[in-house]
């Protein structure tokens, strides 16, 4: 360290150690959530993936939705939902999660990515809560009707299964709070 600053190469290498991803919770007109099953994952998730170099979380979210389910979203279609700090023994990952509610006409344009997404379905909150299946934290929070905000998770692998536990949750605001300008 020179004069309190890390050498640029060390600083850049440190930044590479904390990758980030983006995902989108997409609801239909009935309030059901679009979930996808990738060929290479044992669990269901939502459209999303790693943020490429030079991309913002918003750009990555829009790109991943287009790549995985063939939907072209605009920034105005999205609202911010949450940011998560996901921890495992292998890595730490930031995940930026957005929400979109689309009419069924737009959702009729879904085309699955060849070789990546196996299938998709729309699920209700009740179906997620009643299921004994393990869902990623964002699907579980959506089903529980939790407000967005900040989330920390701990991910563990057990063979081919991944278990993710929320260890911290701070709501973006409380339902009774309002923000006045």
List each model region and its residues.
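Acidic, metal-coordinating catalytic segment for phosphate/diphosphate chemistry
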Residues: 1-23
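Short Gly/Pro-enriched turn/cap motifs at secondary-structure boundaries
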Residues: 12-16, 89, 112
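Conserved Nudix-box catalytic region and its N-terminal flanking loop in Nudix hydrolases
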Residues: 28-67, 177, 181
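Nudix hydrolase/Nudix homology domain
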Residues: 42-43, 115-181
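A short coil-to-beta-strand element that immediately follows conserved catalytic motifs
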Residues: 72-82
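Active-site-adjacent beta-strand/loop module that shapes the phosphate/pyrophosphate-binding cleft
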Residues: 84-109, 121, 141-146
């Amino acid at each position: 360290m020179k004069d309190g600053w890390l050498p640029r190469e060390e600083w850049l290498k440190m930044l590479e150690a904390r990758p980030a991803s983006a995902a989108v919770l997409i609801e239909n007109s009935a309030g059901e959530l679009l979930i996808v099953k990738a060929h290479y994952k044992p669990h269901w998730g939502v459209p999303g993936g790693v943020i490429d170099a030079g991309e913002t979380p918003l750009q990555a979210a829009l790109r991943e939705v287009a790549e995985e389910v063939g939907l072209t979203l605009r920034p105005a279609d999205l609202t911010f939902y949450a940011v998560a700090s996901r921890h495992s023994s292998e890595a730490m990952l930031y995940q930026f999660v957005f929400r979109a509610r689309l009419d069924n006409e737009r959702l009729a344009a879904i085309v699955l990515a060849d070789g990546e997404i196996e299938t998709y379905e729309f699920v209700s909150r009740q179906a997620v809560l009643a299921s004994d299946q393990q869902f990623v934290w964002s699907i579980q929070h959506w089903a529980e009707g939790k407000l967005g905000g900040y989330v920390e998770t701990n991910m563990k692998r057990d063979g081919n299964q991944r278990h993710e536990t929320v260890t911290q949750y701070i709501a973006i605001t409380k339902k009774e709070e309002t923000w006045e300008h």
